[in-house]
């Protein structure tokens, strides 16, 4: 057999092996959950359609666990769960994340290593728990009337949003932690509501649009990025409808002028201006 033909066959074989290797790339989530002997630990993908169980394990006395799954092409979200206790995990490509916690306080007290995004998500989760505690304290205060409760709750929510926008979302809109922040919730009167309201708050819609634009640049055609675009666009439509109704109540309808959609501009990773 000619040497050139041997080299050709070898090159094809290496290319095939490379393709298989790329398709088999995995991420790993390992660690320990103490005080949880005989409890079932679930590893779930937080898909756009809701939680999907990927794997589970019945914990021994030492609480050790190890999960691995196919690496996603864009940042994806998972969670470790025992009953109602949850630890949120973000995975970007072939990361190896290590988590240590104790049941039943794993949701608020855990250590995470190997992922900057997971560390920031932990920070956001703890901030969210503190926010909920503050809201509950205001609602349950015997010294506040209905109007005062509403005003104080609105104030702490606005302060929270401004802090998260400044220190997480607008700072790094392409990060998984920024996406995660958009979908944090708070319980108000037994109703779970999004902290950032994408339906009728034009300032919050701008936040969704900023992350959507950034994801479109860094993770083109990613399902989550496309979903953010849809949320932002629907929110813009709702705001225009509300504004139009308000204007009709205030002035002659013949004088109403409909403006265009909110214009969001961000520089992409190449320095080019991108708009939603």
Regions found by a protein language model. Give the residues of each.
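Bacterial N-terminal signal peptides that target proteins for export
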Residues: 1-10
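C-terminal motif of bacterial Sec signal peptides marking the signal peptidase cleavage site
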Residues: 17-21
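A non-transmembrane, solvent-exposed segment enriched in polar/low-complexity residues
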Residues: 22-171
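Amphipathic alpha-helical segments within well-ordered protein domains
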Residues: 165-170, 182, 212-216
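Amphipathic alpha-helical repeat scaffolds of TPR domains
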Residues: 173-194
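Short coil/linker segments at helix-helix boundaries
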Residues: 188-206
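N-proximal helix/coil linker or "cap" segments that precede and/or mark the start of modular domains
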Residues: 207-274
């Amino acid at each position: 057999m000619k040497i050139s033909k041997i080299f050709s066959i070898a090159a094809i074989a290496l290319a095939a092996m490379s393709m298989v290797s790329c398709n088999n790339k995995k991420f790993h989530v390992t660690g320990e959950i103490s005080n949880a002997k005989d409890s079932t630990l679930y590893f779930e993908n937080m898909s756009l359609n809701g939680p999907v169980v990927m794997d589970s394990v019945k914990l021994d006395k030492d609480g050790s666990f190890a999960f691995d799954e196919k690496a996603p092409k864009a940042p994806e979200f998972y969670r470790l769960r025992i009953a109602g206790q949850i630890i949120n995990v973000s995975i970007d490509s072939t990361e190896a994340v290590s988590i240590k916690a104790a049941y039943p306080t794993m949701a608020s007290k855990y250590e995470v290593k190997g992922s900057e995004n997971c560390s920031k998500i932990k920070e956001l989760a703890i901030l969210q728990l503190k926010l909920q505690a503050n809201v509950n304290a205001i609602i349950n205060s015997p010294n506040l009337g209905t109007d005062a409760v509403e005003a104080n709750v609105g104030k702490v929510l606005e302060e929270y949003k401004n802090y998260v926008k400044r220190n997480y979302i607008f700072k790094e809109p392409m990060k998984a932690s920024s996406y995660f922040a958009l979908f944090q919730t708070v319980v108000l009167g037994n109703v779970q509501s999004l902290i950032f309201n994408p339906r009728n708050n034009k300032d919050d819609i701008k936040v969704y649009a900023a992350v959507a634009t950034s994801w479109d640049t860094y993770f083109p055609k990613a399902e989550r990025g496309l979903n953010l675009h849809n949320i932002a666009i629907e929110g813009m439509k709702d705001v225009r409808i509300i504004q139009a109704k308000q204007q009709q109540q205030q002035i002659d309808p013949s004088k109403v002028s409909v403006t265009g959609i909110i214009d969001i501009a961000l520089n992409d990773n190449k320095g080019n201006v991108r708009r939603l």
